[in-house]
Amino acid sequence: MSESPKKVIVGMSGGVDSSVSAWLLQQQGYQVEGLFMKNWEEDDGEEYCTAAADLADAQAVCDKLGIELHTVNFAAEYWDNVFELFLEEYKAGRTPNPDILCNKEIKFKAFLEFAAEDLGADYIATGHYVRRADVNGKSRLLRGLDGNKDQSYFLYTLGHEQIAQSLFPVGELEKPQVRKIAEDLGLVTAKKKDSTGICFIGERKFRDFLGRYLPAQPGKIITVDGDEIGEHQGLMYHTLGQRKGLGIGGTKDGSEDPWYVVDKDVENNVLIVAQGHEHPRLMSVGLIAQQLHWVDREPFTGTLRCTVKTRYRQTDIPCTINALDDDRIEVIFDEPVAAVTPGQSAVFYSGEVCLGGGIIEQRLPLTV
């Protein structure tokens, strides 16, 4: 008697990647069902329409593939475990990455538990562009095959146990192949553009959105030489390396170079700027990271040579990691790096393998 097929619950977002993931798993012989997560209580008509359209697209794809679609509301979990922390970080003058938190707390925790306990799933699956490989009895996280779409940066908090329970079907494909499969199948999501913006907050204007929850506090914009040249509307709206939206022109002492944010003085509510994207004040020789997560869940000790990304889509930076204590490491870059931003994540790699990462606590500036 043959074994019954393993049951997989696919996180259906209403996008093309999760749609094709569901079909690929069907082809591989799994018993597939979909799940649409509602993680935000809409407070305006436009956002409600977007969420409703995504649900309708997810339902249409599931109908086409002949699979059941479940819906679940994780809005309370999202607010408590993602959004409140996100606001706290902004208040402290840092720039958090809520997509990483959302994957940690919602997609690979709340969703994983719900799928296993309430729906009897053997696995969950998502449309992330990553791969998994089992080495010495532990699941490893690998970069997606499509280097342009690789999303391992956003999944570094996952442990080997979570990866072992997760499938990533499109991680073995390139994006154009995924779109072609969707077109050939006649899926409504085939030509739908990729979502941008904060995970579940969607496409709405970020500045307007943040202003609803945190009161803006205008303050001075000063140059690295101490000259006051403008006013900012709130430090939370600015991040290191930012060029647009400063509201100041380009010329000073004959230089036409644009202004960039090089530092934030949170205590005095001052934004510090300099001209040129390679200004020494913007460069760092390394960083201190905390809140570490290693995929193999083994504590890190000693020293390691590897590469690091300090933001998504960045070219890998060769570096040396030194353990400071149980939950802090020092990272020294081989070459100075621009716009290393506290609150963002530093994610480490050995070749194709994502080792883990941590939150950038402070940068080690090239010039003090």
Curated annotation (Swiss-Prot):
GO BP annotations, alphabetical order: tRNA wobble position uridine thiolation
Gene Ontology CC annotation, any one: cytoplasm
Subcellular localization: Cytoplasm
Superkingdom of origin organism: Bacteria
Keywords: ATP-binding, Cytoplasm, Disulfide bond, Nucleotide-binding, RNA-binding, Transferase, tRNA processing, tRNA-binding
Top-tier EC class: transferase
Disulfide bonds: C102-C199
NCBIfam families for the chain: PRK00143.1 (NF001138), trmU (TIGR00420)
Protein family membership: Belongs to the MnmA/TRMU family.
Subunit (UniProt): Interacts with TusE.
Protein name, entry field: tRNA-specific 2-thiouridylase MnmA
Gene this protein is translated from: mnmA
